[in-house]
Amino acid sequence: MSENTIYSGLKQLGSHTDIPLTPEEAVLERVANPQEGTPYCVRFTAPEFTSLCPMTGQPDFAHLVIDYVPGKWLVESKSLKLFLFSFRNHGAFHEDCTVTIGKRLVDLLEPEWLRIGGYWYPRGGIPIDVFYQTGAAPLNVWIPEQGVANYRGRG
């Protein structure tokens, strides 16, 4: 395999990488989209996302679903995983975590379209669902429903 590929600039993939201590320290990496010009949707699901309540320091848990229609760039999945892991010791409200993730990806990728659904498990008896998207979904791409059921508890 040639040394000069679309992957040659990646620093984290294929090597030991420590989990960043904060989302600000986390490095998201991107690769050229080998299917640029072909409309398609990419989905990442993080069913065990964790952050901390900024007031109590107690853990908060969410099921995240990230969908995007790429343009020139794809997010490198290991860097995304490490970025998401960096929230484990980060104190922020659910809304801030969800929207921050979406905006960081938009800044990095400049996608045709992106949405993130943050389905947060209850704290204080109330589940919070947070949704962010960059605009109307493209009509020429199949974008499935996120498929996360409303929280029902034991019900």
UniProtKB/Swiss-Prot annotation:
The protein's Enzyme Commission number: 1.7.1.13
GO cellular-component term (any): cytoplasm
GO molecular function, one term: preQ1 synthase activity
SUPFAM superfamilies associated with the record: Tetrahydrobiopterin biosynthesis enzymes-like
Annotated binding of substrate, by residue: 75-77, 94-95
Annotated catalytic residues: 53 (thioimide intermediate), 60 (proton donor)
Biological pathway: tRNA modification; tRNA-queuosine biosynthesis
Keyword Cytoplasm: yes
Keywords, in A-Z order: Cytoplasm, NADP, Oxidoreductase, Queuosine biosynthesis
Signal peptide residues on this chain, from the entry's feature table: none
Entry's localization field: Cytoplasm
Enzyme class: oxidoreductase
Known catalytic reactions: 7-aminomethyl-7-carbaguanine + 2 NADP(+) = 7-cyano-7-deazaguanine + 2 NADPH + 3 H(+)
GO biological process: queuosine biosynthetic process; tRNA modification
Main function: Catalyzes the NADPH-dependent reduction of 7-cyano-7-deazaguanine (preQ0) to 7-aminomethyl-7-deazaguanine (preQ1).
Assigned protein family: Belongs to the GTP cyclohydrolase I family. QueF type 1 subfamily.
UniProt-recorded name of the protein: NADPH-dependent 7-cyano-7-deazaguanine reductase
Source organism of this protein record: Brucella canis (strain ATCC 23365 / NCTC 10854 / RM-666)
